[in-house]
A protein has these predicted regions:
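Alpha-helical transmembrane segments and their helix-helix packing motifs
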Residues: 1-140
């Protein structure tokens, strides 16, 4: 029988994996929509919609101001001050997995830990409009 703390950590581990995937899908849609606009400087409404759909308007406004491709990508992928960013979600997944490591199979722990290690190897060029699809496909 699982202790409530163990069950809680496992639930949130799965929930944050799901949240990271949802943010990746939102970013992919925003990227595709912005690519349909002939002038990249006119694509701010697509990126604004992405921030709104992610529910991050307040945290985004505090740190970035006007939505552009680069600052929306930064906020939703690697800004750890944003609890809904992909990096923050992956960190929380790993933290919850570490808390209940003895209750996880070795395969699950290896997958979670490997996911975290691989995400730490991403480079700055992975967080551009051109490099983003590879990262988003990996997350999804």
């Amino acid at each position: 029988m699982l202790l409530s703390r163990t069950a809680d950590s496992m639930y949130w581990m799965a929930r944050y994996i799901e949240r990271a995937e949802s943010v990746a899908r939102l970013l992919d849609v925003g990227r595709r929509m912005s690519s349909l606009v002939p002038d990249p400087d006119d694509a701010s409404s697509e990126w604004t919609s992405t921030i709104e759909a992610a529910g991050c308007e307040a945290s985004f406004a505090e740190t970035h101001g006007t939505p552009t491709a680069s600052n929306v990508i930064d906020h939703l992928v690697r800004d750890v001050r944003n609890p809904s960013s992909i990096f923050a979600c992956l960190a929380t997944v790993r933290q919850n997995a570490r808390a209940v490591r003895t209750a996880l199979s070795q395969d699950v722990w290896d997958a979670v830990n490997g996911m975290w290690i691989e995400s730490q190897e991403w480079r700055d060029e992975d967080f551009t409009v051109e490099g983003l699809p590879r990262v988003l496909d990996w997350v999804k």
